[in-house]
Amino acid sequence: MEYFNVGKIVNTQGLQGEMRVLSVTDFVEERFKKGQVLALFDEKNQFVMDIEIASHRKQKNFDIIKFKGMYHINDIEKYKGFTLKVAEDQLSDLKDGEFYYHEIIGLGVYEGEELIGKIKEILQPGANDVWVVERHGKRDLLLPYIPPVVLEVDLSNQRVQVELMEGLDDED
């Protein structure tokens, strides 16, 4: 079975078994809702166990999560640095024009027929996602995921067609 990263446990939060998680999922409310089952992987990417979410809340840039059956800091301290993943069979079907991060990362970005680079990361700074495009011999390009810029996402051909607005590429 294939698993996809949804967050990394970066620290404990208080004494009641809560953990500070740095989320890397595109559907936070769905992934961390009460009753959701996630897989826990250690620093060597080895499966440890399935865990059930008992509670979730946001605090600044972190998701604060508590696992069912783990109610004290001593129960969870050993999991700092571990990764939370979702099984592929738990992914929901998406509407047209919506994508999971793992589908977008690695796609080639083209303006016309020219390959600009490959998407290496997705940022969520505000209203729109920003795709980080790794380019050969140039600085990374920050590409806003908005209709005038991203014209087409073709998953079957591993290709994103874009039109760079003036000022987006400061190296031209």
UniProtKB/Swiss-Prot annotation:
Ranges where the PRC barrel domain occurs: 96-168
InterPro entries in alphabetical order: PRC-brl_dom, PRC_barrel-like_sf, RimM, RimM_N, RimM_N_sf, Transl_B-barrel_sf
Any GO BP annotation: rRNA processing
Domain remark in the UniProt entry: The PRC barrel domain binds ribosomal protein uS19.
Its biological purpose: An accessory protein needed during the final step in the assembly of 30S ribosomal subunit, possibly for assembly of the head region. Essential for efficient processing of 16S rRNA. May be needed both before and after RbfA during the maturation of 16S rRNA. It has affinity for free ribosomal 30S subunits but not for 70S ribosomes.
PANTHER family according to UniProt: RIBOSOME MATURATION FACTOR RIMM
Protein name per the record: Ribosome maturation factor RimM
Species whose genome carries this gene: Streptococcus agalactiae serotype Ia (strain ATCC 27591 / A909 / CDC SS700)
Protein encoded by which gene: rimM
